[in-house]
Amino acid sequence: PYEKIGAELVKEVAKKTDDVAGDGTTTATVLAQALVKEGLRNVAAGANPLGLKRGIEKAVEKITQTLLSSAKDVETKEQIAATAGISAGDQSIGDLIAEAMDKVGNEGVITVEESNTFGL
């Protein structure tokens, strides 16, 4: 039963990460697994579970502040292409995404669909 609870927790972490960020599910899953493993190890060694929870919450707050303070807006077509290329692992895809975003604007919507036709 504990394994199922853990698996459901990790599934929920991955789903929430995908819903909010659209990326980073592997990182979120690895972090969740490490938090559970180390949390259980500390509780087994006598740590207070509520103290651990408070410590994790403080760490999350600090990390969030640090990330937000170092974040940079992506504004130019070149920045979009570079960022999308890194995310996709392919600069040509990054260039296509930047071109599509340039055409639809900041408030536009881009829909990507799978195709059975090669090259289209």
From Swiss-Prot:
Recorded hits in Pfam families, A to Z, give:
Cpn60_TCP1
Native species: Mycobacterium gordonae
> Among its keywords, does the record have GTP-binding?
no
* Cellular component per GO, a single term: cytoplasm
* Predominant location: cytoplasm
Which InterPro entries does the UniProt entry name for this protein? Answer: Cpn60/GroEL, Cpn60/GroEL/TCP-1, GROEL-like_equatorial_sf, TCP-1-like_intermed_sf
Q: Which compartment or compartments is the protein found in?
A: Cytoplasm
Complexes and interactors: Forms a cylinder of 14 subunits composed of two heptameric rings stacked back-to-back. Interacts with the co-chaperonin GroES.
Please write the reaction equations for the catalytic activity of this protein: ATP + H2O + a folded polypeptide = ADP + phosphate + an unfolded polypeptide
Q: Could you give a single Gene Ontology term from the biological process aspect?
A: protein refolding
Q: Tell me, in a sentence or two, what this protein's role is.
A: Together with its co-chaperonin GroES, plays an essential role in assisting protein folding. The GroEL-GroES system forms a nano-cage that allows encapsulation of the non-native substrate proteins and provides a physical environment optimized to promote and accelerate protein folding.
The answer to whether UniProt assigns keyword Chaperone to this entry is yes
Similarity comment: family membership: Belongs to the chaperonin (HSP60) family.
> What is the recorded name of this protein?
Chaperonin GroEL
